[in-house]
C-alpha cells in the first residue's frame, strides 16, 4: 500500500449511479486518475454526461475554471469490464446495490482481481459489510460513506471494521482530507453510522409532531431551517450544548425523553405516502410538489455550493 503521495493514487469507483458518478467526479477534479465501472454501457454514458453537466454548474458558480471541465473528464475512464477497472487501483470504492448478495459477489471478484495491498472500500450507508464479507487480508476493508451530492458535500464517514488496520484508516483519512473532505472516523460499524442515526432521530420526532397535528410539515421545516440551519453550519450538538449550558441540557434531557416519540416502526404517514407513489422529487410529489426534477436538483446543488462557500468565507474571516 502506498501511504505516501496520495495525490498520485489511482481510484476505481464501482457503480455509475448518482453517488458513484459524483464520487468519480470528486476524485478526478482533485487530480486523480479514476476508472468508473458500470456493467451497463448505456448507464455509464449517462453518468459521464451528468458529470459534465455537474462540472458546468460549478463553472457557473465560479467554483472551477472552464478548462477544469476537460481536464476532469479526461481523468475519468469509463468501462464495463470490472477486471480492467480495478487493475491498477490503489483504492476501490464500491457503490452498488444495498444487497448482501451483490456485495458478496463483487468483493469476491475484487479479492481475485486486486493486489493484496489494494484498499477495498464500500460507500454503503446502511450495511455492516464486516459481518458478511470474506476477503483475504481483511485489514484493508473499510467503509467510506459519502453524502449526496458527493462532489460538493464536505463530509465522509470513515468506518473501521474489527480487523481494519490503523495504517489503512490513516491512509484513507489522508487521501480524503488531502482532497478537501472533512472526515469523521467511526470505530465501530453501528447501524446508520453517525449522520443517518441523527437524521432519522430528527425525522422520527418531526413525523410524530406532524402526525399528531401539532404542527404542519411546512412549519416544522421552517423551525428547523431557521435555527439548526445557521447554527449547525459551525457547531454540532455538543458545541451547541456548551453555549446553551450543559446544565440546561441536563434538565431538558431529564424532562423531555418520556414525552418524545419512542416508536420502533416507520411512521404511518411515510408508509401511506410511499403506497400512494409520493416519493419526493423523483416522483414529482412528496411532502411538497415539484415540476422540473432536473431544475429542482440543480437549484438545490447550487444552494448547497453557495452555502458552503459562504460558511468557508466566514470561517476564514473569524479565524
Feature map (PLM): residue ranges:
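Rossmann-fold dinucleotide-binding core
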Residues: 119-196
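Internal alpha-helical scaffold of NAD(P)-dependent oxidoreductase catalytic cores
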Residues: 30-32, 158-189, 200-230
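Rossmann-like NAD(P)-binding element
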Residues: 43, 57-119, 127
Amino acid at each position: 500500500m502506498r501511504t505516501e503521495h496520495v495525490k498520485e493514487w489511482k481510484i476505481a469507483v464501482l457503480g455509475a449511479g448518482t453517488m458513484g458518478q459524483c464520487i468519480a467526479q470528486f476524485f478526478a477534479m482533485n487530480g486523480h486518475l479514476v476508472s468508473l465501472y458500470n456493467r451497463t454501457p448505456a448507464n455509464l454514458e449517462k453518468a459521464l454526461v451528468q458529470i459534465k453537466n455537474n462540472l458546468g454548474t460549478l463553472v457557473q458558480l465560479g467554483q472551477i475554471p472552464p478548462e477544469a471541465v476537460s481536464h476532469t473528464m479526461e481523468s475519468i475512464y469509463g468501462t464495463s469490464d470490472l477486471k480492467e477497472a480495478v487493475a491498477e487501483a490503489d483504492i476501490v470504492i464500491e457503490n452498488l446495490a444495498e444487497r448482501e448478495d451483490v456485495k458478496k459477489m463483487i468483493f469476491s471478484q475484487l479479492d481475485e482481481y486486486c493486489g493484496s495491498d489494494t484498499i477495498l472500500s464500500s460507500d454503503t450507508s446502511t450495511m455492516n459489510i464486516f459481518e458478511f464479507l470474506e476477503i483475504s487480508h481483511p485489514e484493508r476493508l473499510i467503509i467510506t460513506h459519502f453524502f449526496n451530492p458527493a462532489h460538493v458535500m464536505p463530509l465522509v464517514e470513515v468506518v473501521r471494521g474489527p480487523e481494519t488496520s490503523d495504517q489503512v484508516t490513516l491512509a484513507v483519512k489522508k487521501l480524503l482530507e488531502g482532497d478537501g473532505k472533512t472526515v469523521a472516523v467511526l470505530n465501530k460499524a453501528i447501524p446508520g453510522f453517525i449522520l443517518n442515526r441523527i437524521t432519522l432521530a430528527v425525522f422520527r420526532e418531526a413525523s410524530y409532531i406532524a402526525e399528531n397535528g401539532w404542527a404542519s410539515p411546512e412549519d416544522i421545516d421552517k423551525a428547523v431551517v431557521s435555527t439548526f440551519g445557521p447554527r449547525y453550519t459551525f457547531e454540532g450538538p455538543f458545541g451547541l450544548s456548551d453555549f446553551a449550558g450543559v446544565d440546561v441540557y441536563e434538565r431538558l434531557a431529564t424532562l423531555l425523553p418520556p414525552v418524545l416519540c419512542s416508536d420502533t416502526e416507520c411512521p404511518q404517514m411515510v408508509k401511506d405516502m410511499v403506497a400512494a407513489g409520493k416519493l419526493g422529487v423523483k416522483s414529482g410529489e412528496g411532502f411538497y410538489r415539484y415540476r422540473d426534477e432536473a431544475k429542482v436538483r440543480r437549484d438545490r446543488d447550487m444552494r448547497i455550493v453557495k452555502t458552503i462557500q459562504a460558511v468557508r468565507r466566514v470561517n476564514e474571516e473569524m479565524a
